[in-house]
Amino acid sequence: MDYSEIMVRHGELSTKGKNRMRFINKLKNNIQDVLAPFPAITVRSDRDRTHVSLNGTDYQPIVEALKLVFGVQALSPVYKLEKSVPLLVTAVQDIMTSLYRDGLTFKIATKRSDHAFELDSRELNSLLGGAVFEVLPNIQAQMKHPDVTLKVEIRDEAAYISYEEIKGAGGLPVGTSGKGMLMLSGGIDSPVAGYLALKRGLDIEVVHFASPPYTSPGALAKAQDLTRRLTRFGGNIQFIEVPFTEIQEEIKNKAPEAYLMTLTRRFMMRITDAIREQRKGLVIVNGESLGQVASQTLESMQAINAVTSTPIIRPVVTMDKLEIIEMAQAIDTFDISIQPFEDCCTIFAPDRPKTNPKLGNAEKYEERFDIDGLVQRAVSGIIVTEITPEIVNDEVENLIDALL
């Protein structure tokens, strides 16, 4: 027998009361986005489950994709069949025969939500267990901690049989907690911050600052590849490329070296906030970790934050670098993040950046700039690209190969 579908069990959605179906429908849409590379797949949801019909597709890559989607508590490959006792008997016998090995223990666990079905749960357990003994007389039943628990569900529309429960990613479906702008540089920390924001249901749009010719096409492709990795957790993500060359040249030419980083990040924050307002976001997300670099001291954060009253979420703020690296490796962004392309945060980095910049000094130096004009030109020049989970050639690897 081949699996018919993957049955998805919802996570925290069970606590959402009147909003439950909104959360479930969002999860369904996210699953459809993530499984877009598999055109034969169909997805439907009810209050208790989401059903991913395989329609002949190999189940293993579908399971691997679904394991990453936020809002999924657990999933099981299942056999779907008509609610017929003879069909159930045959299916149970075939499944257990395929799983059998010497010393294997099992139990039948039946749940009947269709109370019009001819047998109740106790009767089905007895009948189906007896059917297994008919074809496997040496198998042993074990009610506590068996090797195989064969789950049989009798629902209104069909019967379902499964024996494997796979842990999902948990969290909330992406998009159920509003929209935020993720400041993604291309380093290790910001993709991890994006992952953690996605886990709590935030629909992120990625803001990436590009400063050609100082930053290369490889840096841009790297940021887009990182964004594509994040789409595995909840579907398509809008990637917003911001032209930043003019601003960086202005800062380099007119500001003291010690304040280059502070002023650069204040401009980045202003621009991200303007894009957030334009695109109806609620928060800004970044990958700052307290004390990790000069721009991430409390004094620096205060001086940079002063340009906006928008809430700023820093998911990795209390994490050690090693913890962030381990999480980056776990979500498969680390190898991309360490590829050798400079981003706009590093191209004009001073040798000794100010670790305790004064807000008054930052504001005084900014009097040398046409702040509104610079921000407006940057925002008007953004390029928005929708990044999907579809499998594409790795642009960054191709660019690295060309350099070698």
From Swiss-Prot:
One of its GO terms (biological process) is thiazole biosynthetic process. Its EC number is 2.8.1.4. GO terms for molecular function: ATP binding; CCA tRNA nucleotidyltransferase activity; tRNA binding; tRNA-uracil-4 sulfurtransferase activity. It is an enzyme of class 2 (transferase). SUPFAM superfamilies: Adenine nucleotide alpha hydrolases-like (SSF52402), THUMP domain-like (SSF143437). Residues 60-165 form the THUMP domain. GO terms for cellular component: cytosol. Keywords: ATP-binding, Cytoplasm, Nucleotide-binding, RNA-binding, Thiamine biosynthesis, Transferase, tRNA-binding. Its main location: cytoplasm. It catalyses: [ThiI sulfur-carrier protein]-S-sulfanyl-L-cysteine + a uridine in tRNA + 2 reduced [2Fe-2S]-[ferredoxin] + ATP + H(+) = [ThiI sulfur-carrier protein]-L-cysteine + a 4-thiouridine in tRNA + 2 oxidized [2Fe-2S]-[ferredoxin] + AMP + diphosphate; [ThiS sulfur-carrier protein]-C-terminal Gly-Gly-AMP + S-sulfanyl-L-cysteinyl-[cysteine desulfurase] + AH2 = [ThiS sulfur-carrier protein]-C-terminal-Gly-aminoethanethioate + L-cysteinyl-[cysteine desulfurase] + A + AMP + 2 H(+). SMART domains: THUMP. Pathway: Cofactor biosynthesis; thiamine diphosphate biosynthesis. ATP binds at residues 183-184, 208-209, 265, 287, 296. It is found in: Cytoplasm. NCBIfam families: tRNA uracil 4-sulfurtransferase ThiI (TIGR00342). HAMAP family: ThiI (MF_00021). Belongs to the ThiI family. Catalyzes the ATP-dependent transfer of a sulfur to tRNA to produce 4-thiouridine in position 8 of tRNAs, which functions as a near-UV photosensor. Also catalyzes the transfer of sulfur to the sulfur carrier protein ThiS, forming ThiS-thiocarboxylate. This is a step in the synthesis of thiazole, in the thiamine biosynthesis pathway. The sulfur is donated as persulfide by IscS. This is Probable tRNA sulfurtransferase. The gene is thiI.
